[in-house]
Amino acid sequence: MNVFMLPSWYPSLRQPMAGLFARDQARALALVRPGWNVVVGGWGHHDGALSLRSAGDSWRALVWRARTRPGWQAGAGATPGPLHELLTPRLSWTLALAQGGARGLLSASRRNLALAQARFGAIDVVHAHVGFPAGWIAAQLAAEPGLPYVLTEHMSPFPFPALQDGHGGPVPALRLAFEQAAATVAVSAALAERIRAFGLPCSDVIPNAVDEARFAPDAESDPARFVFFTLGALVPQKGVDVLLRALAQLPPQPRPVKLHIGGDGPERGALQALAATLGVQDRVRWLGALRPEQTPAHFARCDAFVLASRHETFGVVLAEALMSGKPVVATRCGGPQDIVTPANGLLVPPQDPAALAVAMQAVLTNPARYDATAMRADAVARFGLRAVGERVAALCERVVAAHTAAGRKGGA
């Protein structure tokens, strides 16, 4: 089978962490179906993103566009099965202006699809990640040759403000992506419920895949102190301000309690000022932006992971923490409810520093209640490459079989 994947977000030179889950799912599919050809069609994503707020970022995008040549890419990662990456560079920009340059991304995707077909023959199914732009692009591509496509949604919140109509619902282009898809998938039950609330189809719930080989339980943590770790962009959605307030509310401890914050973003200055105001600046370590190869070591060195998000459709970092054998504390904000169990951590309401502090205190005073080996085994069984890859492969097989049967019936 030939699968053409269209990700709205994908790792790039400027943002190596963005859309890492899309690449991991492509790798998962190639792993469990080594006889298939899995082709990822990209346009550069963050590398070609123009910014109204940063002339420097826009200049870098223009230079990248001028220097980048289209074609097959190397470096998809060590994958037992055939994973192939295509790049046709295009510029993009905010969704508020001309749909972020979606027409140019469509032309790039048409070229990538043609190159994939020239090398491997007819594409059997297109798999788009995120309803816009990739889902909308898939609808345009599928309308021409009659290709079926699968749409997996990750958007948080759904829909993005720039993709809402005057009543807060999905704009027509986003609705089209769902309505024309052969199957629609959400990465969590909460997201599926949200999608259906708008009258859109959502047939399946399949979680994001995590490469378990990157993470392992490790005794690198320092017994003389307790380290909480959080990882994510420093934006309001991630609730780092709530986490800092919770840290300030922890009662005195017999050993030092530290918070390591991985990630960068526009809120960094304000968050550092808040830490100083709360008097916890000496207990916080700002790690800055981390590359994918750097994150496993930080998971290994912490004692527990905290995610204080205001909303999440999944929460890949929670699965990564569990694969590292670390208990988690998270907010009940969507995706975490599908990940956190009494055996691996605690859930609290979002935007509640007091409740978060109570949960953090419970974890740091009784870490022995969490079995690192058992937590990892459970996470691998639910979110590992093979586990998720098999579910995605079965979905692709189901869609292609239905499309083939419909073609036979129509030709009878």
Describe the role of every protein-language-model region.
Residues 178, 289-290, 297-302:
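Short alpha-helical donor nucleotide-sugar binding micro-motif in glycosyltransferases
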Residues 4, 221-238, 244-247, 260:
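Conserved donor-binding/catalytic core segment of Leloir-type glycosyltransferases
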Residues 272-290:
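Nucleotide-activated donor-binding/catalytic signature segment of Leloir-type glycosyltransferases, i.e.
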Residues 283, 369-382:
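A short, well-ordered alpha-helix in the C-terminal region of glycosyltransferases
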Residues 310:
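Aromatic "clamp/platform" in nucleotide-sugar-dependent glycosyltransferases that forms part
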Residues 190, 209:
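Carbohydrate-associated surface elements
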Residues 327-330:
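Short hydrophobic beta-strand element within catalytic cores of glycosyltransferases
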Residues 342, 346-353, 362-368:
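Conserved acidic donor-binding segment of nucleotide-sugar-dependent glycosyltransferases
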